[in-house]
Amino acid sequence: MFLVVLVLIFGCAGVGYGQEPKRILSVEAFDMLNTVPDTYLVDIRTQAEYQFVGHPFKAYNYPYLLFTTTFAKDDEKPSYQLTKNKVFLEQIGKVFKKTDNLLLLDRDGTRSAQAAKELVSAGYKNAFDVYDGFEGAEFPAFDDPNKHKYYRQLAKRNNIYGFEHRRHSGWQFWGLPWTYEMDPKYVYPPDLGAPQK
């Protein structure tokens, strides 16, 4: 009887329990967009990044974080601060189904990993983290924080070409189609009014 109770407790846990988002490269995301039905590219960067840095063709903009008017030092550099978009899940739910393939793209894979986890926890079955992002990580980049810091200091000290530049990986690196054009169909719906798909 005890075994049956354990199976019921752990076997019937909430949707997404223990599940992690799938991780793919932008080139794999592009292939899915062209071959797998009900697949959508969701650019979770801020509206400013989407407009001024450019975005993939047919990428829906649903910012995971929003800029504030607070300017402060964060990590290594002073910059405008970001805050969590409190209606991110609500807005996604107005347009996309929990069974759609949602390919989440940001600048370098940092925010997309967080957003994909949040979608999985909310019951979205096919949330994908496009982990190389639109622009890719800053060069050089390492997962090990100590190694990352050491090599970045080394590159900075020696004036290595491309230091702190992106585009060594990501959507643009692969030469995938992107644009600056702002099609209202793909702009963040609250900025327009009614949701569109």
Give names to the regions the model predicted.
Residues T46:
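Short, glycine/acidic-enriched loop or turn micro-motifs at the edges of active sites
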Residues C12-T35, Q51-D100, T110-K197:
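Rhodanese-like catalytic fold shared by cysteine-dependent sulfurtransferases
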Residues F2-A13:
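Bacterial N-terminal signal peptides
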Residues L41-D43:
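Structural scaffold elements adjacent to functional motifs in cytosolic proteins
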Residues L105:
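Short, surface-exposed ligand- or partner-binding patches at beta-edge/loop junctions that are enriched
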